[in-house]
Design a protein with these regions (language model features):
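N-terminal and secondary-structure boundary signal
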Residues: 1-429
């Protein structure tokens, strides 16, 4: 962890390669040390779809100009871009839909799905729930790490920037472990293997709503820092949060990763936090509060069995992800949905689904009260995945299902097969 922590805020109005290259060059100059050996660039490519999700991932060209700059350093022996995208979706498909493979070809840098490559099991000294991790080879062997998040609001973790980016450092095999009411601790657990040397944040266009199908908001900013905690401290303030209110950021500080006092971070550049926060102050990020959604579906959130807290990162997160995807693909689906109720966790109180169905999502879900509903159905899983729910929620509430998309379903199947072939080729089992 650097003693002198800084964050550079530069106005960048568009994804102009020349301007982005200037800012990236300035960031390396401020860092004061050159990348050496094996360099890994990790962007956010959680999900992409050419028809309805083009604002959830780091701009490929920003990653490309960063790769060009890295190659200028004589001590760099190897350079690769790596990522593990959304669970149950082949990352290679998101690479294609976002343009990352094309960018890699233009800039001559390989783009790798961590799930298709080798890994090794490592012990964690600071982990609370993850005591070991299956660490991707490219992360474990990297001599210099550059994390390149996309600044977004997050449906259950307030913000996603440098720290939350590390969920994409996990293989899908371990992605859903502790992805429940322990998610914020999980994020900090992974920081032990995914501590970057430099953070370059794409905030030219930021995202709000469901982060995997984010709605765009033009902020006109590139943010660079020599410390992931400092980067998140500033990112939190830009999005209107006090740093201590971002739970994974507070937990990271408590575990010794550095102060989250804004005064401990030197802010440089040509635009201030206050001006940027003023720009974002009017954003209402849908799906953070389910009670504010414009829909006839009623939501009842109970506590999880592990911590006695709302299970924010478990089944309700999957519900948010499923509904967010459905509504992004077919806008208005939520507003026009049939009435009913969705319950997650252990809910103390009565549930009223009216004349519609009541879905109990997850193994632990129970209602300690009365249920008024036409039908009651349990959907098993702990936590359940958003993809699984795409076969349940649309039929229950009369919404169009992504499972019947004539374009996307064959792509998922074909790229899943290719993923398995690549895993065999690289002995990634």
């Amino acid at each position: 962890m650097p003693e002198d922590r800084w964050v550079l805020l530069r106005r960048v109005d568009s994804y102009d390669p020349a301007k982005m290259g200037e800012v990236v060059r300035e960031g390396f100059e401020l860092l004061g040390r050159a990348p050496q050996g094996r360099v890994l660039i990790k962007p956010n490519v959680v999900f992409a779809n050419r028809n309805y999700s083009q604002h959830a991932f780091t701009c490929p060209e920003l990653v490309g100009v960063t790769a060009d700059r890295v190659r200028e350093f004589p001590g760099v022996a190897d350079l690769v871009i790596g990522e593990s995208g959304a669970f149950a979706i082949p990352t290679r498909l998101s690479f294609k839909e976002s343009g990352f493979y094309e960018m890699g070809q233009r800039h001559g840098v390989p783009v790798v799905d961590f799930n298709e490559d080798r890994y090794r099991k490592v012990d964690l000294r600071k982990g609370k729930y993850h005591k070991t991790l299956l660490c991707p080879r490219l992360i474990h062997e990297a001599d210099f790490k550059i994390w390149m998040p996309k600044l977004k609001f997050h449906i259950c973790c307030e913000i996603t920037n440098a720290l939350k980016l590390n969920i994409g450092s996990l293989l899908h095999k371990e992605r859903m472990l502790f992805h429940d009411d322990r998610l914020n601790d999980k994020i900090v657990d992974v920081l032990e293997i995914g501590y970057p040397d430099l953070v370059i944040t794409d905030a030219v266009t930021i995202g709000h709503g469901f982060e995997s199908c984010a709605k765009p908001f033009h902020l006109g900013l590139i943010m660079i820092s020599n410390d992931p905690i400092a980067s998140d401290v500033v990112a939190a303030q830009i999005l209107g949060y006090r740093p201590e209110r971002v739970h994974h950021l507070r937990i990271a500080s408590e575990r010794g990763y550095g102060s989250i006092d804004p005064a401990s971070v030197k802010v440089l550049g040509d635009v201030g936090i206050e001006e940027l926060a003023q720009k974002t102050s009017g954003i209402v990020s849908e799906f953070q509060d389910m009670q504010k959604l414009d829909t006839r579906i009623r939501f009842y959130e109970g506590i999880g069995p592990n911590t006695g807290q709302i299970c924010y990162g478990g089944c309700m997160a999957a519900v948010k992800g499923c509904l967010g995807t459905i509504d992004a693909r077919r806008p208005g689906s939520l507003k026009n949905a049939k009435p009913g109720a969705i319950v997650t966790g252990i809910y103390e109180g009565d549930v009223d689904a009216g004349d519609g169905p009541c879905l109990l999502i997850g193994d632990c879900t129970e209602v300690r009260g009365t249920i008024r509903a036409k039908t009651v159905k349990r959907v098993k899983g702990c936590p359940i995945g958003a993809v699984k729910l795409t076969g349940v929620l649309p039929s229950a509430f009369g919404m169009p299902s992504p499972l019947f998309d004539l374009r996307d379903v064959p792509l998922v199947v074909a790229n899943t097969i290719e993923k398995v072939i690549q895993k065999v080729k690289h002995r990634a089992f």
